[in-house]
Amino acid sequence: MADPSSYRPRPGEIPDSPGVYRFRDEHRRVIYVGKAKSLRQRLANYFQDLAHLHPRTRTMVTTAASVEWTVVSTEVEALQLEYSWIKEYDPRFNVKYRDDKSYPYLAVTMNEEFPRVQVMRGQKKKGVRYFGPYGHAWAIRDTVDLLLRVFPVRTCSAGVFKNAARTGRPCLLGYIGKCSAPCVGRITPDDHWDLADEFCDFMAGRTGTYLRRLERQMAEAAEEMEYERAARLRDDIGALKKAMEKSAVVLADATDADLIAVAEDELEAAVQIFHVRGGRVRGQRGWVTDKVEEITTGALVEHALQQLYGEEKGDAVPKEVLVPALPDPVEPVQQWLAERRGSGVSLRIPQRGDKKALMETVQRNAQQALVLHKTKRASDLTTRSRALEEIAEALDLDSAPLRIECYDISHLQGDDVVASMVVFEDGLARKSEYRRFQIKGFEGQDDVRSMHEVITRRFRRYLAEKERTGEWADGEGLVDDARHPNGDAAPNGDAAPNDGAAPDDGAARTDGRGLTDGQELTDGPALKDDDGRPKRFAYPPQLVVVDGGQPQVAAAQRALDELGIDDIAVCGLAKRLEEVWLPREDDPVVLPRTSEGLYLLQRVRDEAHRFAITYQRAKRAKRFRAGPLDDVPGLGETRKQALIKHFGSVKKLRSATIDQICEVPGIGRKTAETVAVALARATPAAPAVNTATGEIMDDDDGAPETTADAPGEPVSAGTPDERRGQER
């Protein structure tokens, strides 16, 4: 458990402004999100004597390892941002905001004959208008209850609606005037649809029209001495104003814009971006960059636009971008943005109103980010430098290992044996360099032999890339590649499902540049990454870390010796005792438990283990979901799912004719013939048995294939805890 004083901000560092704050644990996962009218006063409450804290709060602050905050201008903005972050990060200590597995929206089913107002969760549906998300379902119901006085739209379920239509009697809301009772014909479908449309307009922020109309009607009723009607209209106006307070937004509901602010000094610049969608702040991004040359604010904005939208298309590029200064010239940038969006994009400086006020909020966040970066950078660099120096001293290296590669083997009782390679540069994870391997040189469970194979393959590729780049001036180098068949780095880019890692914890991602299994090296100049560095395995580490003890270290060193590599250090980190093992040494190196170097090695080792076991689980799940279509040459996942979706099951596909198979989009005659032949050769498997329920399933039940609409679950023996205990 952490001591809250270890990460308590220094006096004066926290602003006395409204904002939203996040507590993170030691793995950088967000564990709590909260809002405050005064960040300084609220956060001070968390750092008082632990004995005075609520037990749950005490647990939270001792679990946390850091705290950060975002400044906003009003409490309304803080509320909206808090909702967005809770939805995004799913903090474990924010359970009181959770009413189900997703946040509730106020939804209007405009795709029905009689639109219905209801609370909806989960995936959004076409033809339904959504407003939210809200923190609680009761907040939606309170708002709807107020608005039904003025917009008596249907709220009942389909069953209640049909029953009322059958009996000719409306529900209670129909009797008290909070439903127009379309079920019994009191209102036509067109009029009810218009009523629902007005409800949506009001929720979208276009409130002035309806308030003015009601006020005019109230005045007319009073002039005609219809005081009861005037009083009813007065109450309706009060209900609408109360509902407006409950659903306050940052900007108008139709506003989709990105706001970019820049704070800078002579050496560095901080960029902050608020993404506003539907009038609410849906996300925030930011970074700090070094100013390597004299550069204007407009040029910084241009660089930020390129980084933000360089890979985006369509609606991902908003129709309005608000900036503190325009690039010079601005026309090419606007044209570039319009091409990426497919329609015009307004790039301008806000001059007045809510947008200018929100831009000031973004600017304050940029200024805060720059101040915090400058105060933390020195300590961060010092800590990482000290960790690398401690490792170099403990392992007797000539210099600090700026690039560290760590390898781990994972399997389930000897099946689906895989390996991982993770890379840390300057003490930080470089996920684009991660690689995954399938062990195919032998069958069975042998971690030592597996480690030898992986190290051999990785550094044989390094020598091959080194030869191709012309680093060997004498022309001597690797001649015989002699890899195991289908044995190179496994295809990258398929992040394992349900990894569960928060964005900052870093779900295992690769950049898709690894070679597929069995892909051969070709002659010619080596391709370069965008930053000019050699691709794949051409960049050597200064230190290789293996997850294991003396046997694994000896295997890794033997592999390097066989390849003639003598300038790369090797060590192993054994679990439990956290001992560091070196080649040809009988005794381990024991680093102090408080050592920054040991902590860095543990982080590298744990990341390699996580990456390996994630890939192993995904590979095992894929094997359990394998079906006869997997063996059809040239048939990818997209077309397989198209076939299953079209016919419903493999059983029905097997009985289809070639002409019927050709009717599936993307399936030509030749492919259809190949599919038909493959299914004809494949003997239908015996009925599968669901190990959880004991029921027998055939192809029509969705096993063993996974349909496009309903992803299947891997079938494996034992409880989840038992399977985890068997994994390595």
From Swiss-Prot:
UniProt-listed CDD domains: GIY-YIG_UvrC_Cho
All residue ranges annotated as the GIY-YIG domain in the record: 16-95
Classification via PANTHER family: UVRABC SYSTEM PROTEIN C, UVRC/OXIDOREDUCTASE
GO BP, sorted A to Z: DNA damage response; nucleotide-excision repair; SOS response
One MF term in the entry's GO annotations: excinuclease ABC activity
Protein name as annotated: UvrABC system protein C
Organism, scientific name: Streptomyces coelicolor (strain ATCC BAA-471 / A3(2) / M145)
SUPFAM superfamilies per the UniProt record, alphabetical: C-terminal UvrC-binding domain of UvrB, GIY-YIG endonuclease, RuvA domain 2-like
